[in-house]
């Protein structure tokens, strides 16, 4: 899916260009100022696509039915792994029943295909029914969701730009490519409680002094708080009421979001300082029973502030590495 702001007249032509444009925005201005840059006449709502994460965008090799390895994006916010329509057609995968897929913004009945075996590394998972989406929506041949990721220890090695999947309890190296176990700050390990689909819900997150429940969505570009958090932290909306911002996901329609800036955000005891956020009562919060209490979806904009993040689903723990220094 090519990201765009509605009314701007042009889509961002490529991932590389998108990264360049995003890097040019100062931290305090994004995403609020980025949205404000789109001029329209007459005024029309901005549309912010929840496209596959341009910042983390880490994938792993996955083989279906013994075929050649394909790149599947890691998405810790997706309850089910999915395959692109184009790959399903190429492999001649038979149709399965429609299933209800719960996305960030909505739930939607979605077609599936039957897969005899999914191979991830040396592990083989037989007999899966996988939802099907257009490749441009996924941004890859498929994605790995929590139904499979929860069987692993997942390392998002931001500094080295790679993702690692290990068996629970298996050791992994974190650091620059070719650099074994290099760490500049000790990891901070926090425990999480289990969500309905295996998500790890963390509590060591504080937004402007407000204790906040949070979960990691590695497939989301932006971090999004619910309206209960916005009220509790007394964050003033920055969105122009004449130009409402709307957000679209792969599943379901658009939802209205507000923009604002937290004065101080802390994750696992690490202070991130002033941080721009989006706010909406997303379907994802409802699914996790987090509508009434302050809650935050941790997206790529915050995950990439850390050297690495390790999700150990077997032990119910998340480890955050040191903060990266951004120029």
Residue ranges and their predicted role:
Residues 2-12, 17-327:
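Pepsin/retropepsin-fold aspartyl endopeptidases
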């Amino acid at each position: 899916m090519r990201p765009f702001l509605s009314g701007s007249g042009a889509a961002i032509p490529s991932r590389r260009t998108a990264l360049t444009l995003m890097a040019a925005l100062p931290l305090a201005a994004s995403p609020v100022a980025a949205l404000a840059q789109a001029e329209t006449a007459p005024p029309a709502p901005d549309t912010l696509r929840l496209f596959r994460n341009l910042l983390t965008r880490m994938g792993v090799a996955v083989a279906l039915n013994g075929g050649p390895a394909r790149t599947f994006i890691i998405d810790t916010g997706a309850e089910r792994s999915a395959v692109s329509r184009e790959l399903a057609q190429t492999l001649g995968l038979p149709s399965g029943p429609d299933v209800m897929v719960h996305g960030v913004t909505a739930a939607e009945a979605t077609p599936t295909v039957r897969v005899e075996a999914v191979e991830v590394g040396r592990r083989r998972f037989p007999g899966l029914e996988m939802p099907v989406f257009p490749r441009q929506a996924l941004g890859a041949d498929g994605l790995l969701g929590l139904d499979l990721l929860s069987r692993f220890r997942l390392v998002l090695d931001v500094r080295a730009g790679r993702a690692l999947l290990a068996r629970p309890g298996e050791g992994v190296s974190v650091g620059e490519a070719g650099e074994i176990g290099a760490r500049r700050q000790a990891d901070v390990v926090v425990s999480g409680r289990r969500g309905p689909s295996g998500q790890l819900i963390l509590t060591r997150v504080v937004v402007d002094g407000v204790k906040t429940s949070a979960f990691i969505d590695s497939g989301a570009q932006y971090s999004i708080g619910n309206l209960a958090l916005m009220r509790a932290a007394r964050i003033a909306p920055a969105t122009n009421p004449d130009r409402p911002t709307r957000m679209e996901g792969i599943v379901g329609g658009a939802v209205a979001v507000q923009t604002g800036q937290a004065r101080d955000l802390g994750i696992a005891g690490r202070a991130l300082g002033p941080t721009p956020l989006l706010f909406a009562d997303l379907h994802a919060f409802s699914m996790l029973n987090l509508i009434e209490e302050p809650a935050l979806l941790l997206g790529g904009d915050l995950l990439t502030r850390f050297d690495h993040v390790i999700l150990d689903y077997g032990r119910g723990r998340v480890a955050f590495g040191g903060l990266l220094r951004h120029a």
